[in-house]
Design a protein with these regions (language model features):
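Conserved glycine-rich cofactor-binding loop
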Residues: 6-8
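Conserved glycine-rich Rossmann-like NAD(P)H-binding loop of the short-chain dehydrogenase/reductase
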Residues: 22-36
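Substrate-binding pocket helix/loop in short-chain dehydrogenase/reductase
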Residues: 85-86, 90-98, 198
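Active-site helix of classical SDR
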Residues: 109, 150, 158
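Residue(s) in the substrate-gating loop at a strand-loop-helix junction
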Residues: 134
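Short C-terminal tail/terminal secondary-structure segment
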Residues: 139, 204, 218, 229-242
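Short, small/polar-rich loop/turn modules that mediate ligand/substrate recognition or access, typified
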Residues: 166-171, 228-230
Length: 242
């Protein structure tokens, strides 16, 4: 199951997982976006099922989850950012971002975990929960205080979950990308001064592509990472190494 699957990283992760053989359940608020992703997945001979859903609506997500017979992998991806200087953060923006990036991430993970645990052979087959975090869950950045707070919270959530869900053989990790060339980041990079400053902070000298992150997610979803839990896979071109 991939949340926020209509665009950007969620779309790329859904396609990568389908290519790897997963039966992908894709969620987004926008049906037209889901239709486009489903079409791409069909072209790769993959399998998908889509649901229109706002993950900030607890009961709505809960109802959709009841329609899903089996769940082995969660990519907890839905999120957003509204850059503002800390002293000028609007209350409505702080509440919107925290509801989506933290509260909804918690609720989705909790409900999915409960469903995964109920599988009779869970300890044998295992499971994987991957939170889409950020390098900004590791380091600070100007104009991103609320996002910093949210993603540091997601990092803590993942570690606590990893300890508690290990007894069910459910692994929990995060993927922490640098700035990725998604529709959202392209809007930020219209500010050339900001873009150039960000590029100077990436030793590899480029922003990440969606595929860079999607392949990291696919790795953490696969059996090849079966001994990896409670950690972060940082896809940042060296930013946080400095």
């Amino acid at each position: 199951l991939v949340t926020g699957a209509g665009k950007g990283l969620g779309k790329a992760c859904s396609i990568a997982l389908a290519e790897a053989g997963a039966k992908v359940i894709i969620l987004s608020r926008t049906k037209s976006d889901l239709d486009k992703v489903s079409k791409i997945i069909r072209k790769t001979k993959g399998s998908s099922k889509s649901f229109v859903c706002d993950v900030t609506q607890f009961e709505e997500f809960k109802r959709i989850l009841q329609k899903i017979k089996r769940l082995d992998i969660l990519v907890n991806n839905a999120g957003n950012n509204r850059p503002e200087h800390f002293t000028k953060v609007k209350r409505e923006n702080m509440e919107y971002l925290t509801n989506l990036n933290m509260k909804a991430a918690f609720n989705v993970a909790q409900l999915c975990s409960q469903k995964m645990i109920k599988a009779k052979n869970r300890k044998k087959i295992g499971g994987s929960i991957i939170h889409m975090s950020s390098q900004l869950g590791k380091v600070g950045c100007e104009g991103r205080n609320v996002y910093n707070m949210n993603k540091f919270g997601v990092e803590g959530l993942a570690r606590g979950m990893a300890v508690e869900l290990a007894e069910y053989n459910i692994r929990v990790n995060t993927v922490c990308p640098t700035f990725v060339e998604t529709p959202m980041v392209k809007q930020f990079f219209k500010n050339k001064k900001f873009k150039n400053k960000m590029l100077r902070n990436i030793p590899l000298g480029r922003v990440a592509q969606e595929r860079d992150v999607a392949t990291a997610v696919a790795f953490l979803a696969a059996d090849s990472s079966e001994m990896i839990t409670g950690t972060s896979l940082v896809v940042d071109g060296g930013w946080t190494a400095q």
